[in-house]
């Protein structure tokens, strides 16, 4: 019994622990957890663990609900959407608009179709007096300062809470105080309800009356109902796990498909990038060639301009040279004419000279003949002196004192004499 007190599994310490949990909302009541589960047979409503009751519920408009539903293809299909996209409204079997006519079942059906099936129940918890744990913990919006405070906030119970009123009844408390035995965990409400079993440790201290038997039967019925509901919940949980497993397998298949498509798209993108790189390189090389050709064209144009200038200059120089050639030709012709005239004049002078020489030779021969007659047997070319006729011709002159001929005249005379001998 002392060990049970130390561990807090039962007795007065267990009662104190349950009272603290009932007052300050540190846990959830199993009776509230599985309450009204027979009415909610839909798969979207499950009896979940304590996390379902960690939301903020209530009718206060300032409170923000954490029940977020997923969006699907049915979301937003209200009258505003029908008017916006010019859609026909939904009609019931009688041909009237079910939403406009206020058909509650049609509204619920459409609302259930428009919203996906949530794992967490969407209906807010009712303000039941037996909910002494999780619901009261989250009915008040607690700030960060309150959460950071080490002290446990004081939350008073409801005034019309029959469970707490019965729990803190003076007769019951006095009875517990008078009892030499400590209460067990099974006797404390708020935990899993179970039939009252016989306590062997109590030696016929308390005899159960008919009310206790009736309560025992009610506990058994509720207990079996809870087991049946737990069985249904277990089946639904298995179905949910199966659905989750199938969705996970489908997710893996989709992931493999997306991965393969990503690899193919990535390979295609790499090929496109390579082609783009090759195209850019070709475009760059073509641009360089275009620049070089344009530069060569500019150089060619400049060279052509220079060539045209050079050609014009050459034409001018050619004209100048032609003029000089014409001038030189004219001068040459003049010189040739002058040379011809001089040659003719020279020939005439030579003829004159020859005629004079011939006359002189005749005179010389006549004188020689006369001398032969005067001096017989004498030779005009002997070693003795002989007279020479004075002859004046330009620069050739005869000196009367020396009786000698000019040297040039003698040379010319000898040449003429030689010519005459050859002719004869």
Swiss-Prot record:
- Skewed-composition ranges (Low complexity): 64-75
Query: What are the entry keywords?
Result: Coiled coil, Cytoplasm, Cytoskeleton, Phosphoprotein
Region of interest called Disordered, as start-end residue ranges on this chain: 34-76
Report which residue ranges the record marks as coiled coil. Answer: 229-355
Question: Where does the record say this protein resides?
Answer: Cytoplasm, Cytoskeleton, Microtubule organizing center, Spindle pole body
Q: What's one GO-annotated cellular component?
A: spindle pole body
Q: Which residues carry this modification: Phosphoserine?
A: 29, 73, 115
Q: Where is the composition biased (Basic and acidic residues)?
A: 34-48
Main subcellular location = cytoplasm
Describe the family membership recorded for this protein in Swiss-Prot or TrEMBL. Answer: Belongs to the BBP1 family.
What the protein does comes down to: Component of the spindle pole body (SPB) required for insertion of the nascent SPB into the nuclear envelope and for the proper execution of spindle pole body (SPB) duplication. Connects the central plaque of the SPB with the half-bridge. Required for proper localization of CDC5 at the SPB and for proper M-phase progression.
The record describes its quaternary structure and partners as:
Homodimer. Interacts with KAR1, MPS2 and SPC29.
Q: What is this protein called?
A: Spindle pole component BBP1
Q: Which organism is it from?
A: Saccharomyces cerevisiae (strain FostersO)
């Amino acid at each position: 019994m002392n060990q049970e007190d130390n561990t807090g599994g039962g007795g007065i310490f267990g009662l104190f622990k349950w009272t603290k949990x009932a007052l300050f909302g540190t846990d959830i009541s199993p009776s509230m957890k599985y309450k009204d589960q027979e009415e909610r047979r839909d798969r979207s409503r499950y009896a979940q663990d304590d996390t379902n009751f960690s939301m903020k519920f209530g009718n206060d408009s300032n409170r923000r609900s954490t029940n977020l539903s997923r969006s699907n293809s049915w979301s937003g299909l209200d009258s505003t959407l029908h008017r916006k996209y010019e859609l026909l409204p939904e009609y019931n079997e009688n041909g009237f608009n079910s939403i406009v006519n206020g058909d509650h079942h049609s509204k619920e059906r459409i609302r259930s179709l428009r919203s996906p099936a949530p794992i967490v129940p969407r209906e807010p918890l009712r303000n039941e007096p037996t909910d002494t744990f999780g619901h009261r913990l989250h009915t008040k919006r607690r700030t960060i300062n309150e959460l950071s405070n080490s002290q446990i906030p004081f939350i008073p119970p409801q005034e019309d809470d029959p469970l707490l009123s019965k729990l803190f009844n003076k007769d019951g408390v006095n009875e517990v105080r008078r009892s030499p035995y400590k209460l067990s965990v099974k006797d404390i409400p708020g935990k899993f309800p179970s039939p009252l079993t016989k306590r062997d440790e109590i030696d016929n201290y308390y005899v159960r009356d008919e009310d206790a038997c009736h309560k025992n039967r009610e506990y058994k019925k509720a207990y079996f109902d809870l087991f049946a509901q737990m069985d249904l919940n277990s089946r639904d949980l298995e179905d949910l796990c199966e659905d989750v497993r199938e969705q996970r397998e489908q997710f893996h298949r989709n992931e493999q498909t997306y991965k393969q498509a990503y690899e193919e798209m990535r390979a295609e993108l790499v090929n496109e990038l390579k082609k783009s790189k090759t195209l850019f390189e070709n475009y760059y090389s073509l641009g360089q060639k275009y620049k070089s050709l344009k530069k060569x064209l500019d150089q060619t144009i400049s060279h052509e301009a220079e060539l045209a200038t050079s050609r014009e200059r050459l034409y001018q120089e050619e004209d100048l040279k032609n003029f000089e050639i014409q001038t030189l030709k004219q001068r040459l012709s003049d010189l040739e004419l002058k040379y011809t005239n001089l040659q003719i004049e020279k020939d005439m002078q030579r003829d004159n000279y020859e005629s004079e020489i011939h006359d002189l030779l005749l005179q010389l021969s006549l004188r020689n003949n006369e001398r032969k007659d005067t001096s017989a047997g004498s030779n005009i070319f002997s070693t003795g002196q002989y007279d020479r006729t004075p002859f004046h011709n330009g620069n050739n002159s005869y000196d009367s004192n020396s009786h000698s001929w000019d040297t040039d005249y003698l040379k010319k005379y000898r040449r003429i004499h030689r010519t005459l001998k050859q002719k004869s």
